[in-house]
Each structure stands twice: as C-alpha cells, then as structure tokens.
C-alpha cells in the first residue's frame, strides 16, 4: 500500500491512495453499504483478502483510499482505518493481548487510553503498569515475565512530554516485546516511528491528520501480519469508519505539510509570549524544558 519511495512526503500526502473513479481528481464518496458480489470479489473474500469490496463494515472505497494514504505517509506495509482513535487503540489491544498478559504504558497517556487500560482491560485479565514516558529505564523496570507490549506516545496528550522513541525501541527489542506508539500529537510530518523500529503506529485522525475539527477517526499502521490481525478485530467489533468521514480525512491529509509548519510556529510563539506574561504561572509546550528530553536520534526523517 506504500507510495513509490521517490515521492517526497508532501507529494505522498496529496496523491497516495486516491481512487480516480471516472477520472476524478479526488476519491468520490461511496455511500453504499454493499457492493456487487462479482466472481473476482467472491474469490478475494474466500481467500481472506482484507480490502475486498463486499460490505462497508469490512471495507469501502473511501476507507481503503484513506488507509493507503496513511500507510504511505508513515512508511508502513499496511494500514487500517477506524471510526475513532479509541476504536483503533482498543481493537489493537484486544487483538494482540490475551488473558494474563501485561502492558507497560505511560502514566501521562491519553485519558481515553488510560481508562481502557485501568478499567476495561483488567476485567479481561490484562494488567497495565504505568511508567515515566521520559525515562526508558522506568519502562524496563516495569517489565514482567508476562509483558507483551510497551505502549508509548510520541508526544503525550495533553501534557506534551516528548518520548525518546529509539531508546524505548531498544528496551522493547531487548525483551522481545511489541512497541506501539500513538503518533497523534506529532503526525507523520514531524515523526515516522516505524523507521525507528516501532512495530505499530496509531493515530487519532481527528487531530492533525484531519486538521479541521470536523471529523472523528482513527488508524493503525504497521506490518501486513499485525494489521491482518487488527483488521479481523475491526470486522468483529464493528469500529469501521463511514465513507463521508473518510472523504473528509483524505481531504485534510492532503494539506498536512502545508499546515504543520504554520501550526508549530504559531504555537511556539504563543508559548513564548505566555511564558513572559506576569499572570501566567506555567506553560507546557514541546519547545520548553517541561517537555524536552535528549533524543538519541532525530525524530524528523
């Protein structure tokens, strides 16, 4: 599903995944719950092909187009899209973990993820230990014999702490664990964790990828093997995105490389001015000491 390697990132954002039906420049919105069961589609379904167009809970033209674009942006082998970021996270956890398994995650993890790990997964016999996102040694100290996943965020939501991804990957590889990163607050514009050895990248596409506060969505990117497992969960749990949201998301992703430099510049300037304001007690921003750590390798590819 990846776009040609000779395309620059901004070009991939615009062109990867677009389905030019009827010579259209953009992927049209396919408001169809069901597709005709041709012999070719039946053969694909019987062979277990993920992106066979039969029923929109399984796959749709619009969800496939968005998945291909996100896959190209993150440099993955395959991707799946979801109705929300939490649908992506919960489906991933439920398909990769079993009763008796253990996760190490950040104490600063997104609130919805924290609730999943501390309230819902324990009911299924899956335990989580919270560690310091800025201290890989605290993650390593929390690892148990039954640990299966190290879960991190590139930049924590909402406290904006920056994670040393290469160092976390080293910890994961030493213990033969999956390393999963929520890359929502960095976006592929700033960081492409798969290139650093991460196993799966998760997004709430509601945020920077969508970019206009008018959609809800999620995505997971990684190897074909892992995405195949997660796709099966999406089919069974029903967290598939609707075509209109996918169309809006595809539109938003085209302008990611145009939007992010302005967004990051403006937020840094706002943080600087607030820091100088006499009535402001504390400011959290990735350019300020509360967020920054030493990164062992550049996060911008």
Q: PLM features: residue spans?
A:
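Short, basic and Ser/Thr-rich N-terminal targeting/leader segments
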Residues: 24-25, 75, 242
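Active-site lining segments that contact anionic ligands and/or coordinate catalytic metals
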Residues: 26, 280, 300
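Flexible glycine/acidic-rich beta-alpha junction loops that bind and position SAM and/or redox cofactors
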Residues: 70, 289-292
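Acidic-residue sensor for enzyme active/binding pockets
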Residues: 74, 153, 297
